[in-house]
Amino acid sequence: MSQVKIGQFKFGQDTFTLRYVLGGEQQVKFVAKDIASNLKHANCAEAVRKHVDGKYKSTFEHGEIRSHLASNALAKQGDPLYLHPHTVLVTKEGVIQLIMKSKLPYAVELQAWLLEEVIPQVLCTGKYDPAIKHQQEETKRMTDRLIKVFTDHTTTLHAALVKKEKFVEFVVESNNKQIEAKNKLIEAKDQHVTRVMTDLNRMYSSFQDTMQRKDDIMKRKDEIIQKKDEQFQETMQKKDEQFKETIQKKDEQFKETIQKKDEQFQEIIQKKDAQLQETIQRKDEQIARLIDAAMDLSSRAVQYPADERKHPVLCVARDGTTFHGIAGQRRYVQSQKRKLGVKDDDLVLETRRPNPALDWTNATHTTSAVKRSKRSITFDSPEEAQLFEDTIKYLLSVDSVHK
């Protein structure tokens, strides 16, 4: 049964420590990580994945050596002879691919040494020993020593000498057979390497053809892109011209719209001015009539009672835009002020008048109030309310009494 082995492989001044497994059909597989590490690959896993074809590598669990997992289980994890089931193994072809992709200056010599010396010896002996090639010389020297000893003891050891001679002949014959087998194996390996190199040359030629086709495709792609760019430039130029025309039309339409709006605004302003002039004219006429009425009243001679509490009084109070008028004798006016809660700050005027009720009627009947009653009037704006207050103060200022 094949087992995981580890060996020291000396090449020149360098010594490689490699783990390997002998499989069926005279095939040896090396641990891929050991090979890549000794070949100075920076990333061993990446180098194996990238440079070694799938048919030249397998895992320790799923490869041809699956039946040897039981023997591997005897080695504990951490032992150099222990291999994880997912450990990647490579054949000699995979080793050649890793050597070809390495940057070592002696990669060619290393490949020849591996194919011609290491792998054949491992296949024949199960291990690699640099001294095995001197075995014949050592055997010959041992034979010479034995012959000398046998010569000295010919009488007593003749039978043993005959056996030793037969043994030597057997050893020599075995060595010759091994050498012949090695030569045949090397010849077969050379033929295989030749086929591999032929395949590689064919693959390289195919790669060159593929790269040439790729260059042609890229050239056609560049031409298409250039045409697309020219078409895009033409389209963008047309779009710019259309956009400028649209902007110009919109600008003209906007100017026409602004001109129309200005004309409409001028018409509205003129109408508003005319309405305002009419309103002012009506107000002026109302004020003139009020002034005439007041002047007429002021020209009359009035005689008031001796008791001031019986004097006729007109009181006007303001609450926002609403005015309240209280007309009657002073005693009545005072009681109504208290009843309505009129404060001094709310008074517009409080004046003695010959006929306060008539004065209030004359002052309010021509105004454009929103809401009116017998003794109150409401305006829709503070400006109109203030105009009414100023007018009534002016009209009824004669004999006014403010309290």
Curated annotation (Swiss-Prot):
Residues 3-126 form the Bro-N domain. InterPro entries: BRO_N_domain. This is Uncharacterized Bro-N domain-containing protein J.
